[in-house]
């Protein structure tokens, strides 16, 4: 597993000397009342999307964040919890943990509401989390799991599943790629550490989550990320990489398979006021209803000429039914 050592070295260097845009992409910073993000945290934002969403953070959840970076998303999570050890940050790189501790001191100076004790930083491995079973409401990782190869990815997801409470949420952002990558790219340890050559197709990424037992999956965003071109990388063709934001919910697995929301909607436009499929789905006339892919398929299979099923937008924002 030498690629994991390479990854440690890359992020050890990034902790000692912040590298803007090292592996990821510049993301808009949440503008929240009374929240000021120190510049150093922004420079050390090694994520490829956002894992912080207010709808996940009601009722004072206990949050776990794996791969702390410069601490920016930990600070954002703490904004919602504002309690001692309300957010637990785990990282395998000592230098990154130390950098985050220093950054939290700066955050205290800029935010009167924030105390460093709101975040409990721990040395630990994503493959063996120092966290008790069923103790976390919201777990998060940003641009980390794409680095793992198949065996380690399974272990990392299983660990997140283990520590989450029933109905807890794993929120993630990772690069994905729908094209085949050659073995030279796949086996380049530095490119993998830089979140470039470990990207999976969305279907495989989602399957890794459902295989772990997550009964509900929400794909919340999908956007451009990187290009690997033949002039700069060992590839004969242009490779387009996207990033996605996903929530995997520790719901019981339905008998007919997981509920995967990819942004599809059903619209009934018939003569009646509504359509009821007698399976828990009521479509009010001319009102779009968000549905999971499984339900979308079942409605399409009815062959009706008064129900429209949209394509996946990959921007599911809640509501609807499965």
Predicted regions and their residues:
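Short alpha-helix
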Residues: 197-212
